[in-house]
């Protein structure tokens, strides 16, 4: 990507970007929520569509001159519908959090009750955390995982729902390595008259590839990010398998009186003008590019390899006496409890960073340490699989990580990190980014 003009005009930003290019090229990216977007996606992100205001929706804009951004947004919507097999898509949310906010604001009033997976058990801030709008504006109740199995117990979810009687149940996670039984969640939601929202931000690419349970037949709403396993630009999206008349009593005036608004109309209005103004048309164009890529047969091959690599890593870690929360993985990530290794997540993250391996510290279920220290790390395979990682590489990477963590308290840790970093650089040369990530 040519940056001659930027180099001449703003050396500070140019130097920061150049350093980030070097970091992405020469280190192993194992943060589960990160990936490498294609050059085509990045070109769309940097296109002239960043200059265009387009409040509203295709064919119903508040600004003139939107005929070409309309084409881009319609392509993005149509491709997303085909990719996920759904009737309704809104590609305008700026982020996954914006998408979740749009749904919550559309169907809830302040003080309404919601249920979501506890943040410390693998959930997300927007699923009811007290430091987030979802836990401040609404009465949030959190379900967790079983202490013994590390998995969600649907019997306990049902018990809580029957006691709490929430208006919305959220099923989804940011650090949970098992799949979700969306049908079972819908059965619970129906028993208490609740809406059901699936947040598939993490496994969206695997779901699109048909490798995990499909939420569309069971959930009223499905939200996602467009990066992570979808390998697109940073952004959000809201979907519905089938549109339906809203049961909230929201109507619209017509020439003959009034009619009940479809739920799609309610969601659209909540995104714009409810919580956003002008959409990011350059990002929406890039979303369309990414969805087009995900519709190609090669994307399923990629998704299969993502899951295979994760399974191999989890098995190898277990063989080295690392505790994988829930006992293994069925998706792209794993959460490792390091308490039996006497290393905190913070220490592990920092030491691995010194060795050229990027992970994130993460709380584990029933953690006794703060979110700034944690007892675990989260590891994912999407980014390295984009670079061409196969099972043999995955096994070697586990070996790199084990060498560092095993020496964490030793006097020779600096030497170990330096040796691993040398091995990491060699692997990175064998796994070039090619058409993905920085040049």
Swiss-Prot record:
Stored InterPro entries: PyrdxlP-dep_Trfase, PyrdxlP-dep_Trfase_major, PyrdxlP-dep_Trfase_small, Ser_HO-MeTrfase, Ser_HO-MeTrfase-like, Ser_HO-MeTrfase_PLP_BS, SHMT-like_dom
Biological pathway: One-carbon metabolism; tetrahydrofolate interconversion; Amino-acid biosynthesis; glycine biosynthesis; glycine from L-serine: step 1/1
Keywords from the named record: Amino-acid biosynthesis, Cytoplasm, One-carbon metabolism, Pyridoxal phosphate, Transferase
EC number(s) reported in the record: 2.1.2.1
Subcellular location: Cytoplasm
Keyword Cytoplasm tagged: yes
SUPFAM superfamilies reported in the protein's UniProt record: PLP-dependent transferases
The protein's required cofactors: pyridoxal 5'-phosphate
Protein family membership: Belongs to the SHMT family.
Biological role stated in the UniProt entry: Catalyzes the reversible interconversion of serine and glycine with tetrahydrofolate (THF) serving as the one-carbon carrier. This reaction serves as the major source of one-carbon groups required for the biosynthesis of purines, thymidylate, methionine, and other important biomolecules. Also exhibits THF-independent aldolase activity toward beta-hydroxyamino acids, producing glycine and aldehydes, via a retro-aldol mechanism.
NCBIfam families: PRK00011.1
Record PANTHER family: SERINE HYDROXYMETHYLTRANSFERASE, SERINE HYDROXYMETHYLTRANSFERASE 1
Name by which UniProt lists this protein: Serine hydroxymethyltransferase
């Amino acid at each position: 990507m040519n940056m001659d003009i930027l180099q001449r005009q703003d050396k500070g930003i140019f130097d920061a970007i150049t350093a980030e290019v070097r970091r992405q090229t020469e280190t192993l990216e194992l943060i589960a929520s990160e990936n490498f977007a294609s050059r085509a996606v990045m070109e769309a992100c940097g296109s002239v569509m960043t200059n265009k205001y387009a409040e509203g929706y295709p064919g119903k804009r508040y600004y003139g001159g939107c005929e070409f951004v309309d084409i881009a947004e319609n392509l993005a919507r149509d491709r997303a519908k085909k990719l996920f097999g759904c009737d309704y898509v809104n590609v305008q949310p700026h982020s996954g959090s914006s998408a979740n906010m749009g749904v919550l604001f559309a169907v809830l009033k302040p003080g309404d009750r919601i249920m979501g997976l506890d943040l410390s058990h693998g959930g997300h801030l927007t699923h009811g955390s007290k430091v987030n709008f979802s836990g401040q504006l609404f009465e949030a109740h959190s379900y967790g995982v079983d202490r013994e199995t590390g998995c969600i117990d649907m019997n306990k979810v049902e018990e809580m729902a029957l006691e709490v009687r929430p208006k919305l149940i959220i099923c989804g996670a940011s650090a949970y390595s098992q799949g979700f039984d969306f049908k079972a969640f819908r059965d619970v939601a129906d028993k208490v008259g609740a809406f059901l929202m699936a947040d598939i931000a993490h496994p969206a690419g695997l779901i699109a590839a048909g490798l995990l349970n499909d939420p569309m037949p069971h959930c009223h709403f499905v939200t996602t990010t467009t990066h992570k396993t979808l390998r697109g630009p940073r952004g959000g999206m809201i979907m519905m398998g089938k549109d339906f008349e809203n049961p909230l009593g929201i109507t619209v005036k017509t020439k003959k009186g009034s009619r009940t608004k479809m739920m799609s109309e309610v969601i659209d209005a909540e995104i714009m003008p409810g919580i956003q103004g002008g959409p990011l048309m350059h990002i929406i164009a890039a979303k369309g590019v990414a969805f087009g890529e995900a519709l190609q047969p090669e994307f399923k091959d990629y998704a299969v390899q993502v899951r295979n690599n994760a399974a191999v890593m989890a098995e190898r870690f277990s063989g080295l006496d690392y505790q994988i929360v829930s006992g293994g993985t069925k998706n792209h990530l794993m959460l490792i409890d390091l308490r039996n290794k006497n290393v905190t997540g913070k220490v592990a993250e920092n030491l691995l960073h010194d060795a050229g391996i990027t992970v994130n510290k993460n709380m584990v279920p029933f953690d006794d340490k703060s979110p700034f220290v944690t007892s675990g790390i989260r590891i994912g395979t999407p980014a390295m699989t984009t670079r061409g990682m196969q099972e043999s590489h995955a096994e070697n990477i586990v070996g790199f990580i084990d060498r560092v963590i095993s020496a964490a308290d030793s006097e020779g840790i600096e030497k170990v990190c330096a040796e691993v970093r040398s091995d990491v650089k060699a692997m990175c040369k064998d796994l070039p980014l090619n058409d993905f990530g920085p040049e």
